[in-house]
Amino acid sequence: MKMWKRRGQKKSMFLSSLLVCCMFASAEYSSCGEYEFFNQTSNSCQACPQCRPGQEPNMSCGHGMKDEGFACVPCPQGKYSKGKYEICRRHKDCNALYKATVREPGTAEKDAECGPCLPGYYMLENRARNLYAMVCHSCQNAPLNTKECKKTTEAIIKPPINPGSTTVLPHPGSPGQGHLATALIIAMSTIFIMAIAIVLIIMFYILKAKPNGQACCSGQVVKAVEAQTNKLEDKKDVPDNVVIFPEKEEYDKLKASPQKTVKSENDASSENEQLLSRSIDSDEEPTSDKLRSSEATNHNLCQANVGYKPDLCLLSLGLLDHRVVCNGTPASAGSQANNTQAPNHITSSNVSSMNAINNNNKTPGMLQSRRKKILDLYARTCHVTEGLSPTELPFDCLEKASRMLSSSYSSDAAVVKTWRHLAESFGLKRDEIGGMSDGLQLFERVSTAGYSIPDLLARLVQIERLDAVESLCADVLGSNEIVALVGRQSVNSFHSQLVCPSPCTSPSPRCASV
């Protein structure tokens, strides 16, 4: 028995000593920094070897561990690195992505630098002219007075002619091309004639199968004329002292569809202004004089019954700036006090006036100032996040941007681009885009390819998604600076019943810490 007790004591002592050694070893490894490894010879943490510019580490080193065979290897062709512990990144593709010329080609130690736009492309003047804002657009959508596009059209219209020669020789063409053009014209003419003949035959059989069509139509006309004459006779029979309320005629007028807004045919920025009008309020609060005038001219709006319209949050945000109030009471109280008309009749007669107020509030000047502020935020964010990849942002920031890019809706000018259009702007193939489910996978893919946060913002500007640019800039710069620059206005309790709440009113502390 004593022998067994001694053996048990020896085993327990051995296990306890082994646990103590493991605890000391783990404590020593955990005390090392991000780019340090634990040297068992010197029993201390040492810094990992740094690579020179144009090189990258082939193994991992840091947090107390160092892989065997750690060394610095040169960057492959088409990539660059600034040295130390940075991996090699791909050079900027000025021609394919930015549609610009190459000012300085990229080397193994620095990135490529883009120059002016390619022939047939131009750059908007109201955008920041920095390294990451060199986004050129096609001259097909350019205004008439664009200088870069004028040069291209003049070069096409006025080809160079030798002043010494007085005759212009035609271009020699092969006889085979002439015969091919003739055959193509004959084939197209034959197809066109056959199509016309088929249409005429079908129309002939349709008219032959329905011989009583004209009689039916003439009978309908006769019935309509008789109905009008009967109405006139009924009106004549009514005495003069009887008052007739034309409720049906007024109701028919109210049921008429509102006029469609005229689309702007300006440059590519007009489409973005129409998109921004869905998500912004007016930047300036109306004065008391404007409030009095709006109460006098739009007093019918105070009769809108909010209780009968739970989906009034889909109305334009222009109602927030007008603050429709009658004698200190909200619109719902006005509708309850007035019992002369039905609620459905009141609301149907006021929807068109609400849309008219919304269209008057969102003037082009407000949209331009809003666009300028967002582009200023974009330029500042590019300066702050230079060299950072998108995956270095917190997960909740990337998830919010992915949700914004996943929602697709149509505006008056164009269809809002989604993350799939963003992937196409990065040059990804459709097969690869089809394998992705959301924007988070796209952010991880472009980060692996070596693109940075400014590159991502530049693509968002290129596809006209300034709302996503504003969201990412707000997450990076923080809420205080965004409030000072953009100046959003607060909403009182009554108007909060009319507007759907925003999914993310302010960036989280994790986003603002970037």
Swiss-Prot record:
Cysteine disulfide links: C32-C45, C48-C61, C51-C72, C75-C88, C94-C114, C117-C136, C139-C149
Membrane topology: Single-pass type I membrane protein
This protein's GO CC annotations: plasma membrane
PANTHER family membership: TNFR-CYS DOMAIN-CONTAINING PROTEIN, TUMOR NECROSIS FACTOR RECEPTOR SUPERFAMILY MEMBER EDAR
Spans annotated as Disordered: 254-294
GO MF term (any one): signaling receptor activity
Protein's GO biological process: apoptotic process; cell differentiation; dermal bone morphogenesis; feeding behavior; fin development; positive regulation of canonical NF-kappaB signal transduction; positive regulation of JNK cascade
TNFR-Cys repeat boundaries on the chain: 31-72, 74-114, 116-149
Keywords: Apoptosis, Developmental protein, Differentiation, Disulfide bond, Glycoprotein, Membrane, Receptor, Repeat, Signal, Transmembrane, Transmembrane helix
Biased composition (Polar residues): 267-279
Transmembrane segments: 184-204
Summary of the function given for this chain in its UniProt record: Receptor for EDA. May mediate the activation of NF-kappa-B and JNK.
Topology, Extracellular side: 28-183
Protein name in the entry: Tumor necrosis factor receptor superfamily member EDAR
InterPro entries according to UniProt: DEATH-like_dom_sf, Death_EDAR, TNR19/27/EDAR
Localization in the cell: Membrane
Domain of life: Eukaryota
Signal peptide span: 1-27
